[in-house]
From Swiss-Prot:
Subcellular location: Cytoplasm
UniProt-recorded name of the protein: Xanthine phosphoribosyltransferase
Residues the entry annotates as binding 5-phospho-alpha-D-ribose 1-diphosphate: A128, N129, G130, E131, A132
Domain of life, source organism: Bacteria
């Protein structure tokens, strides 16, 4: 998606450790117009998948996830990283390692928000090694739901997440696919 690639070139910062900082428009400050455009693109890409619910992870997946859900006309649920004291019902849980933060989180969704009849579209901000996507897929599978697609705003194709998802048969769409970082610059596929 050219608009997104241009925004990454303009405002993204490559940090040590193959980390791309895009906090000025995606995962700290949010550009709502850009998020709506991303949501429209996800809706276009998955329009024939029969999506009944979007599933994402807090916090950075929420903005693109809600816009995709809005454009598809379906609800969105986000996996929490900490179980609130108000949650007393059954939950689905999965362990997720964060490449950027180098920590493992237990993500959870209340069981009443996912069911076996759901056709889930997983949306997330980044795909690196695929840990968040795998965790979200696990939550959907625990509910007996079918994952009909995975949409990511930015993928680092040089890490293993892309290959894992494709090799396991998931329909993956990345709005910006990074081939590599070279001399502080982003090189797109």
């Amino acid at each position: 998606m050219e608009l997104l690639e241009e925004r990454i070139k303009k405002d993204g910062v490559v940090l040590p450790g193959n980390v791309l900082k895009v906090n000025s428009f995606l995962n700290h400050q949010i550009d709502p117009q850009l998020m709506m455009t991303l949501g429209q693109e996800f809706a276009r890409l998955f329009k024939d998948a029969g999506v009944t619910r979007v599933l994402t992870a807090e916090a950075s997946g929420i903005a693109p996830g809600i816009m995709a859900a809005y454009c598809l006309g379906v609800p969105m649920v986000f996996a929490r990283k900490k179980k609130p004291s108000t949650v007393t019902d059954a939950v689905y849980t999965a362990e997720v390692f964060s490449y950027t933060k180098q920590v493992t989180n237990t993500i959870s969704v209340e069981a009443k928000f996912l069911d076996a009849n759901d056709r889930i579209l997983v949306i997330d901000d980044f795909l690196a090694n695929g840990e968040a996507a795998k965790g979200l897929i696990s939550l959907a599978e625990q509910a007996g739901a079918e994952v009909v697609g995975v949409g990511v705003v930015v993928e680092k194709a040089f890490q293993g997440g892309h290959d894992w998802l494709v090799n396991h048969g998931y329909h993956l769409e990345a709005l910006a696919s990074i081939k590599e970082f070279a001399d502080g610059q982003v090189i797109f596929n």
